[in-house]
């Protein structure tokens, strides 16, 4: 049964909670290093910094607390926002980045690498709660946890019977314990908070799925902007970012030689495409699993072998999940894997791999090799190496995507926040940024790569029916 006593109490007198403030100087140095690689954010500061369009607005961030995110926070701060921040993953915080932001005073930060799930949800609620008990005007979300906590809180306030139940999902039970405590200490909190939220901008595929589901069933409580499906996010962060950061995570964790190995990539969306091409670039034989015939055909025509997981389980040396679905690697699959096969996930949540099978079985045992690297002995007698406890391998075992590609994503995030700030009367729907802004994000990053655009003549623009300054493609165009 849900039990408020199991939730960590909020302490609104806390300015910050990070692992080690003495790491702030290191964080500042890395932030300075990333500036040149994040031209989109720097341009937004130059363009909007003087007018402070976010002045007087409270912003909650629930997004990986990395050096790149520190630059996003700096941008929001320079635009006038009052900011509180938590990470959206228990392993993704870079403690020197959190220390630098906490020390700078640009935001109140509640994040450290290696949080427990109870601590994680405490941090999320701390980021959503100002000292006077009020909540945010705007939310920057990644995976939808901050948005979900508000929605589940409102749902429980309307139907307290939800708190009388027990939940099989361990993490969801922790969420409900958290909500039970907030309802005990501050009745009506979540309904009050939700009513003041102007909107949320969502970073990733998983969070966007949640938003569209709520929009469809009529439960979405405030407007949302789908940042993930901006072309300059999904076709860059998801594809090119994963193409570099996946290998970084696997190699830092295991020092394994990828060349000559068989790598199984589950899912061939934008993230899966980046992963498959990365592994092939390192010399691996790559197998792909897919449910979508279009994505499967794309993979096959790129020369990848498209198989089922039942076929791939005994073949793979390294397994990478990138589906956004759950239990795509089951206990049965793991039992059939090679001895010491490496299993990791680059989707947002930890349920793509059936970690419960490993954790709940008395016949499976775990030996921790080093942080975020566990050797699980299976019923079969063989072992597998699980990275980051099934959570994001690129952020759990390395430092995530490079600064340049994150500048694309985070420039979209800031533009989305500006749209929400300047349009307080939007309907409770999921929006996407207009094509003109998408093209502008790309334009801001060209000079850093030495790229130069061709300019249409008046006659050429008229011939193809576009404005000389864009947009150059219709909304339905697939890049």
From Swiss-Prot:
GO (cellular component) term, any one: cytosol
Coiled-coil stretches: none
Catalytic activity: S-adenosyl-L-homocysteine + H2O = L-homocysteine + adenosine
SUPFAM superfamilies, A to Z: Formate/glycerate dehydrogenase catalytic domain-like, NAD(P)-binding Rossmann-fold domains
This enzyme's EC code(s): 3.13.2.1
Associated pathway: Amino-acid biosynthesis; L-homocysteine biosynthesis; L-homocysteine from S-adenosyl-L-homocysteine: step 1/1
Main localisation: cytoplasm
Residue numbers binding NAD(+): 204-206, 238, 267-272, 290, 325, 346-348, 394
Compartments where located: Cytoplasm
UniProt-annotated binding residues for substrate: 66, 142, 203, 233, 237
InterPro entries: Adenosylhomocyst_ase-like_sf, Adenosylhomocysteinase-like, Ado_hCys_hydrolase_NAD-bd, NAD(P)-bd_dom_sf, S-Ado-L-homoCys_hydrolase_CS
Keyword Transport: no
Disulfide bond annotation, renumbered to this chain: none
Keywords, in A-Z order: Cytoplasm, Hydrolase, NAD, One-carbon metabolism
Pfam families found in the cross-reference section: AdoHcyase (PF05221), AdoHcyase_NAD (PF00670)
Top-level division of the source organism's lineage: Bacteria
GO biological process, one term: S-adenosylmethionine cycle
Cofactor: binding comment: Binds 1 NAD(+) per subunit.
An example molecular function term from Gene Ontology annotations: adenosylhomocysteinase activity
Cofactor(s), by name: NAD(+)
Function: May play a key role in the regulation of the intracellular concentration of adenosylhomocysteine.
Family: Belongs to the adenosylhomocysteinase family.
NCBIfam families in the record: ahcY, PRK05476.2-3
Protein name: Adenosylhomocysteinase
Lineage: Bacteria, Pseudomonadati, Thermodesulfobacteriota, Desulfovibrionia, Desulfovibrionales
């Amino acid at each position: 049964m849900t039990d408020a006593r199991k939730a960590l109490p909020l302490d609104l007198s806390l300015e910050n909670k990070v692992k080690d403030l003495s790491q702030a100087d290191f964080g500042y140095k890395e932030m300075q290093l990333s500036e040149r690689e994040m031209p989109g954010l720097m341009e937004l500061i130059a363009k909007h910094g003087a007018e402070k369009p976010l002045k007087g607005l409270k912003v909650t961030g629930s997004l990986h607390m990395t050096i790149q995110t520190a630059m996003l926070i700096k941008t929001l701060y320079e635009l006038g926002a009052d900011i509180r921040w938590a990470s959206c993953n228990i392993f993704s915080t870079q403690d020197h980045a959190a220390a630098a932001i906490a020390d700078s005073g640009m935001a109140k930060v509640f994040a450290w690498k290696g949080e427990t799930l109870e601590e994680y949800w405490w941090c999320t609620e701390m980021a959503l709660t100002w000292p006077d008990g009020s909540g945010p005007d705007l939310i920057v979300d990644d995976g939808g946890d901050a948005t979900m906590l508000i929605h589940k809180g409102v749902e429980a306030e309307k139907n307290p019977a939800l708190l009388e139940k027990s939940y099989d999902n361990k993490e969801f039970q922790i969420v409900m314990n958290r909500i039970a405590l907030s309802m005990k200490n501050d009745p009506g909190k979540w309904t009050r908070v939700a009513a003041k939220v102007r909107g949320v901008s969502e970073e990733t595929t998983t969070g966007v799925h949640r938003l569209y589901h709520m929009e469809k069933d009529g439960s979405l409580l405030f407007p949302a902007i789908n940042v993930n499906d901006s072309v300059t996010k999904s076709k860059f962060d998801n594809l090119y970012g994963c193409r570099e950061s996946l290998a970084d995570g696997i190699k830092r964790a295991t020092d394994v030689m990828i060349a000559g190995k068989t790598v199984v990539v589950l899912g061939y969306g934008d993230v899966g495409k980046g992963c498959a091409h990365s592994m092939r670039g390192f010399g691996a034989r790559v197998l792909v699993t897919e449910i979508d015939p279009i994505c499967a055909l794309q993979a096959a025509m790129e020369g990848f072998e498209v198989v089922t997981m039942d076929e791939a389980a005994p073949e793979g040396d390294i397994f990478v999940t990138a589906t956004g679905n759950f239990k795509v690697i089951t206990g049965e699959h793991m039992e059939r894997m090679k001895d010491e096969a490496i299993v990791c996930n680059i989707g947002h949540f930890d349920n793509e791999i059936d970690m419960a099978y490993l954790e709940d079985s008395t016949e499976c045992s775990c030996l921790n090799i080093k942080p975020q690297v566990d050797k699980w002995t299976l019923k079969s007698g063989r072992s597998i190496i699980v990275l980051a406890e099934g959570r994001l391998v690129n952020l759990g075992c390395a430092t995530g995507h490079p600064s340049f590609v994150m500048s694309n994503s985070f420039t979209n995030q800031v533009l989305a926040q500006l749209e929400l700030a300047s349009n307080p009367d939007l309907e409770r729907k999921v929006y996407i940024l207009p094509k003109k802004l998408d093209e502008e994000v790309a334009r801001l990053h060209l000079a850093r790569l030495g790229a130069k655009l061709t300019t249409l003549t008046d006659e050429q623009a008229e011939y193809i029916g576009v404005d000389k300054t864009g947009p150059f493609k219709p909304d339905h165009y697939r890049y």
